[in-house]
Amino acid sequence: MDTSSINAQSIFDDNAATLKLSWLTGHEGWERGFSSESVANATSSADLVGHLNLIHPNRIQVLGDAEIDYYKRQTDEDRSRHMAELIALEPPFLVVAGGVPAPPELVLRCTRSSTPLFTTPMSAAAVIDSLRLYMSRILAPRATLHGVFLDILGMGVLLTGDSGLGKSELGLELISRGHGLVADDAVDFVRLGPDFVEGRCPPLLQNLLEVRGLGLLDIKTIFGETAVRRKMKLKLIVQLVRRPDGEFQRLPLESQTVDVLGLPISKVTIQVAAGRNLAVLVEAAVRNTILQLRGIDTLRDFMDRQRLAMQDPDSQFPGKLI
């Protein structure tokens, strides 16, 4: 991942209002950031932001009340040595939290070394939690997929398929049935956690749906505020296909999944043909997926009943084993 755009200046600009940050000194080091190696080796954002720790270099160091009190109890020699070690680590920047004054020696060393030094009245714990959440979003794996992303019955569903199969028309019908639009054509997905992928609409395409023959439709203006969503977790992919008779698997014995940012996402394939009510089929697929997430598998239950019936000697099942 390219980390060149993540530096002290960008982090300050994005969080100054939320964290009430003030840039005390070290403005010349605005380009300081994280090395690619430190980001690659980080198991989570906790490795990139934390309380003062001289063992972990190249991370955002936050000094709270406890760290400042410890500093004050040290001898002049120990203070100088600790400050020298801290600056030598070349952290992206330092934050003195809790509204306590920054030690004069720390300010002087940050000025001389062009190390950005921020201050905030907020507690160190609040600053660390907020910056960790921010870093996890910034550095999360991302991908842009083609399709129509909808909120159907509270589940994030991505409609995919070849061009011309009617994905946008199907999306429009589902919206008219009370479901919500997240994004059309291009959907930005980001993996924010170990078990979920979140999808959003690019700002340029917000609330828009393109339908052949009608052009661009502003869904929010036409259907109202409740017809659009800002984001949804991706739980199901519905792939629309057009295949000749005899080439479509009616009862797939194995659950289909698609890898999205390293996470397997359930997939359902629906054949497009004249006379088929695709909106009803998609809704049924979503309801069935909800049952499967609750541990209810209709096909597996049927196969279990079939096996028991075939093994029962008193059963009138026509295909029982003799």
Curated annotation (Swiss-Prot):
Gene Ontology biological-process annotations: regulation of carbohydrate metabolic process
Region (Important for the catalytic mechanism of both phosphorylation and dephosphorylation), start-end ranges: 209-218
Keyword Kinase on entry: yes
GO molecular function: ATP binding; magnesium ion binding; phosphorelay sensor kinase activity; protein serine/threonine kinase activity; protein serine/threonine/tyrosine kinase activity
EC number: 2.7.11.-, 2.7.4.-
Enzyme class, UniProt record, top EC level: transferase
Binding positions (ATP): G161, D162, S163, G164, L165, G166, K167, S168
Cofactor list: Mg(2+)
SUPFAM superfamilies in the cross-refs: HprK N-terminal domain-like, PEP carboxykinase-like
Important for the catalytic mechanism of dephosphorylation: annotated span: 271-276
Keyword ATP-binding among UniProt keywords: yes
Gene3D superfamilies (alphabetical): HprK N-terminal domain-like, P-loop containing nucleotide triphosphate hydrolases
Superkingdom of this protein's organism: Bacteria
Keyword annotations from UniProtKB, A to Z: ATP-binding, Kinase, Magnesium, Metal-binding, Multifunctional enzyme, Nucleotide-binding, Serine/threonine-protein kinase, Transferase
Function of the protein: Catalyzes the ATP- as well as the pyrophosphate-dependent phosphorylation of a specific serine residue in HPr, a phosphocarrier protein of the phosphoenolpyruvate-dependent sugar phosphotransferase system (PTS). HprK/P also catalyzes the pyrophosphate-producing, inorganic phosphate-dependent dephosphorylation (phosphorolysis) of seryl-phosphorylated HPr (P-Ser-HPr).
Family label: Belongs to the HPrK/P family.
Entry's free-text remark on domains: The Walker A ATP-binding motif also binds Pi and PPi.
PANTHER family noted in UniProt: HPR KINASE_PHOSPHORYLASE, PROTEIN YJDM-RELATED
Protein name: HPr kinase/phosphorylase
Annotated source species: Paraburkholderia xenovorans (strain LB400)
Gene: hprK
